[in-house]
């Protein structure tokens, strides 16, 4: 929690602290950069540096106040070259109106005015100072303030406001961006207070692997036993043991539509017609024999 000598606005709720701990925002790396030492709480026996969560919350509130002080939200540029933060910066930009650069940062975006992607933001926010070093370097050339999510081993050169947190985990990155967006909207008046539940869940800011999501959808849509039954049976709907239940009523309905005396009548008709046909054929054979024998009778050998 925040120290007692700070204003009450810096006090975080117990739910916020629990979310930060659950997302492992307090777990840093084994290396420690000298400028990140004030944000360190302790070092575990296994060498992992633990970050002070109270300091993390203070910097989130401070960064949100800086963002809210900018009149035009589009003058804020959020950047993430790290894949785990690309979805988060896009969601942050959608909810706050900022400009997002997700993926590779094109060199010259802030310095080369000839390029189509040239921007002149008043503030940039980066996910990782190490992977987004090109954006920070160009921002230093044109005097753009920088807010960065910094781990214990992150370089802090040209970083004006460092938010100490775990910037390598997908849940930690998504939660920090979500809290930052919620705090900005609270300062703008969109959200009444921190106690008011935001209708945007934090899961929307988490990274999702496209291939894993596609495979998951395929597995959910896949019919069990498709390899054994075959595609034709799946299209007809006769899969597994259900065909007996579907075929039996069909035969029953067909049999019910036929009158009870239809079977003997059919046999009788068929027998009569066959007998008549046989008799006609026999008569034809006798007539043919008579016709052929008649000329032979008058022939003298």
From Swiss-Prot:
- So which domain of life are we looking at? Eukaryota
UniProt-listed InterPro entries: Ribosomal_uS2 (IPR001865), Ribosomal_uS2_C (IPR032281), Ribosomal_uS2_CS (IPR018130), Ribosomal_uS2_euk (IPR027498), Ribosomal_uS2_euk/arc (IPR005707), Ribosomal_uS2_flav_dom_sf (IPR023591)
Q: Which GO terms describe its cellular component?
A: cytosolic small ribosomal subunit
User: Disulfide bonds, which pairs?
Assistant: none
Keywords for the protein's UniProt record, in alphabetical order: Cytoplasm, Ribonucleoprotein, Ribosomal protein
* Alphabetical list of NCBIfam families matching this protein: uS2_euk_arch (TIGR01012)
Quaternary structure and interacting proteins, as annotated: Component of the small ribosomal subunit. Mature ribosomes consist of a small (40S) and a large (60S) subunit. The 40S subunit contains about 33 different proteins and 1 molecule of RNA (18S). The 60S subunit contains about 49 different proteins and 3 molecules of RNA (25S, 5.8S and 5S). Interacts with RPS21.
Please explain the role this protein plays, according to its UniProt record: Required for the assembly and/or stability of the 40S ribosomal subunit. Required for the processing of the 20S rRNA-precursor to mature 18S rRNA in a late step of the maturation of 40S ribosomal subunits.
The identity of this protein, by name, is Small ribosomal subunit protein uS2
Give the species this sequence originates from: Blastomyces gilchristii (strain SLH14081)
**Gene name linked to the record:** RPS0
